[in-house]
Amino acid sequence: MPKMKTRKTAAKRFHVTGTGKIMRSKGMKSHLRRNKSARVRRQFDEMSQVAGVDRARIQKLIPYGVS
């Protein structure tokens, strides 16, 4: 059976941890940050875990767990 192809757009946006969790970046980081508090801006910089309902779809996009 041929190798499965990794969707490169998904590989740039998600990464898989050593324990198998799929992590993503949070949105709202690029602009319109001035009216947000420093605490909220720091929270946007953290990585977030992908929701369980989306996990199976993303695993199909990155079958080899590209990090």
Swiss-Prot record:
Concerning Gene3D superfamilies, the annotation shows: 4.10.410.60
Q: Which Pfam families match?
A: Ribosomal_L35p (PF01632)
Q: Which Gene Ontology cellular-component terms appear in the entry?
A: cytosolic large ribosomal subunit
Picking any one GO biological process from the record gives:
translation
This protein's UniProt keywords: Ribonucleoprotein, Ribosomal protein
The record's section on InterPro entries has: Ribosomal_bL35, Ribosomal_bL35-like, Ribosomal_bL35_sf
Domain of life, source organism: Bacteria
Which SUPFAM superfamilies does the UniProt entry name for this protein?
Answer: L35p-like (SSF143034)
Q: Which Gene Ontology MF annotations are present?
A: structural constituent of ribosome
* Stretches of the chain forming a coiled coil according to its record: none
User: Member of which family?
Assistant: Belongs to the bacterial ribosomal protein bL35 family.
Q: What is this protein called?
A: Large ribosomal subunit protein bL35
- Lineage summary: Bacteria, Bacillati, Chloroflexota, Dehalococcoidia, Dehalococcoidales
